């Protein structure tokens, strides 16, 4: 073998045939022992033969290292040892030989030693410390090749402990003359950053060196530095999300050290992001130079200059432009140019840059013009014959859907064809796109398509993805409860059985986690908490029909002697047993199904191979059905005896409980009541019995929790503590903001502060207002044209002429209490408007009249409000801000948007004309799936998303709202019962509460109600409270039911209170009210 190979090389050298340089170099480095090893391993036919060959080779290598050999022979043995290590065999005997080889003066031997150590030595090995000396010698060498070999070895052999020994030397090498040394030095810094983390960049010297390398003249050094910045941006691109997680950890952790560390991480990440965003113009400039082709020809690959550098720059810009409008504005021009340049090259590299550019434009702050341009370029991918191109086209569409869903419309046929593609990866990505484009209008056809694929698919991973997608969109966009129940029940019936051996062999993890599906338990909550009986009847009909069908199939297979009946999943059996046991009584008479038949079917399910927890659910369901039936069955005694000795402890417990319940038939309905899943337990009754029992035995009397801590129920603090901010009802609201002073009272609408008696100045103002009102009644003024006020925003208000879009009467805002004058002004205004409409019927309501150009867009006018008044809740009326007059630049932008919309519509029409020969079934499916987008083409995407989120309440949020409401009701009931207990235990109280009827006060209350000045009356009129809590002589409270304090009645409550009592309730009532009460 060896002689023939040597003869071949000698023949080639002696002949005139040119011998390849690579073959000559291999001949100089290796002998033919390595060739024999590789050939014998390739020709081996079994694992045993391969092991035998490797063991013999290891014996040969040990004998070679034990003898004195030449350096070339040792180098060849190290290469054979690397090959054995690559096949998975341990070669610890050669580590010391490789370390000695790194100290050789010949560069080839030194590089072989470094390569062997970096590949064969594990992390944190003892010999790594011994390699530090040889690496430092290599870094200090005058030969740049030795320096490069040492830097290459550092990327694999250095750990956190040895970084300080090399850092300063690596920073010095960034100024080396050779660009390859500078490039490898930047790569070593990148390795240091990955080992240490963000704290490595705390040194300003390192950041300055990285910026210097970014501006290096050699493109290889520049591309190496881009990789470091890319890693930093990927780690800190989602800064807000990371900060929220860290803040949540701070709230959960009580340790000051952990909080301090987390705060340091937040500050460090902010500094790094700000540093990177300062470099955005530099990154944009580099991308522009590379796209223009200013690099040397050695960096050209398939006609494109340095495509990997362009891709890294695009990823970096996408991370920095995420949710940052200022940074994104620097990128738009260069990204458009890069996209245009990539379209010139119809090869894989050009397609890769085009796809990455589209992805970047969808991730940064969106520019609709550029995104529309991206959607046109997606046709290059989708019309390609190769599945890989279509795969990237579907991925690009999925990224565009997040920004502008209507741009998917021209490619609806291609998407539907991809859904039926034989390529599995393309099909999965198409269904992912279908999931992302789901909205409230197309949720039904999308779910049906996903369920259809769920039935046909055999890949368990793909099935788990489809199940999560179906349940997510069903909970988010469910049109009604019936549809949600049908969808989730269908998904549960399709789920595979966990105990099936084939499924366990395929994917144990997914099948064992079926019990963790939250959507199944949401289904139980929805049905149990729903008040509509039709919902409960519907779900019980579904599961009872499934029982009947499965019984028929089982009987047929028993007759045919077959046992291939597909079992349902454990989670499906749990839901089915619960539903049937709770609500089967609603439809038993309609379907002719008897409880005994259902019980017998459930007993048959116990014989099948289900989990112990699932069988416990079945036993509980049988117990509920027996309670409804009112008698025991013979089969149940056998069943309970059998499962008392079950391997599952929970089955033993449930069967024992059922056996005890069957002994007392009268107590069945009490222990297992009908439809009592969501009934609230009254703990007061339970604990009162415990309290009575402890009193009889001689225990101590129960003391409430509030009294144990000596905390009063009502604030009885002195006037000295009146300035403390305490929680309580606020009976005062601020005065209306001055419309002519926009900076007044904008931050806090309802400031909480202590109430003070009115000053003399305020009393004088009230008297002047009353005198003005009397004068207006005697001498009514002529109605004036109301001054127009244009509300532009929170900080800007501008007085305009009578041609304002939103006429607002400033007098009404400044003096809302003048009710009679408002009525007179409104009557005069209506008369003037009628006259104006008769004169100018084309321009009613005195709105702004402009004569727009033909090409200019029409201004959008707001409707005239009836009233804009300041009340306790703020402004009442149409508060929408009218648009400003469009500037010439805005008019040009609006014209451009209109032309772009018309062009996009024309392109859609042309695209639809090209697909006239489409299968009608596909066309019908496309209308169903994409119908929601065609209806909302002219809407803004952001507003559309917000509207869907507001109008569309998911199942989970619905259940959470119900839960919070129930908890509030329970807490209110507890508070009321607790107050009653306090009143019962309190001593006899002395108080005089007189309710008198006073007509004068009635008139005053009506006037004050119109003027919004009497806060006490407003409280009664707005809240319609029928309960009045009065604190009398200390800590006790008394509940007085007052049916005459509603908004319709005008009776006055007079309380005869002592001075101490008035001091006690000064935190809840105003000072003015107290003075009036004391006077009365």
Swiss-Prot record:
Enumerate the Gene3D superfamilies for this protein. Leucine-rich Repeat Variant
Q: Where is this region: Disordered?
A: 711-782, 801-920, 933-973, 996-1027
Which branch of life, at top level?
A: Eukaryota
InterPro entries recorded: Adaptor_Complx_Large_Subunit (IPR050840), ARM-like (IPR011989), ARM-type_fold (IPR016024), Clathrin/coatomer_adapt-like_N (IPR002553)
Report membrane topology. Answer: Peripheral membrane protein
Q: What is its main location?
A: Golgi
* Localization in the cell: Golgi apparatus, trans-Golgi network membrane
Comp. bias (Low complexity):
762-782, 801-847, 878-911, 936-952, 962-972
Q: Where are the HEAT repeats?
A: 161-198, 201-238, 369-405, 406-443, 445-479
> What GO terms are given for molecular function?
cargo adaptor activity
GO CC, any one term: AP-4 adaptor complex
Q: Which UniProt keywords apply?
A: Golgi apparatus, Membrane, Protein transport, Repeat, Transport
Q: Which GO terms describe its biological process?
A: intracellular protein transport
Name the family: Belongs to the adaptor complexes large subunit family.
Q: How does it assemble?
A: May be part of the adaptor protein complex 4 (AP-4), a heterotetramer composed of two large adaptins (epsilon-type subunitand beta-type subunit), a medium adaptin (mu-type subunit) and a small adaptin (sigma-type).
Main role?
A: Probable component of an adaptor protein complex. Adaptor protein complexes are vesicle coat components involved both in vesicle formation and cargo selection. They control the vesicular transport of proteins in different trafficking pathways.
Xref: PANTHER family? ADAPTIN, ALPHA/GAMMA/EPSILON (PTHR22780)
Please state what the protein is called: AP-4 complex subunit epsilon
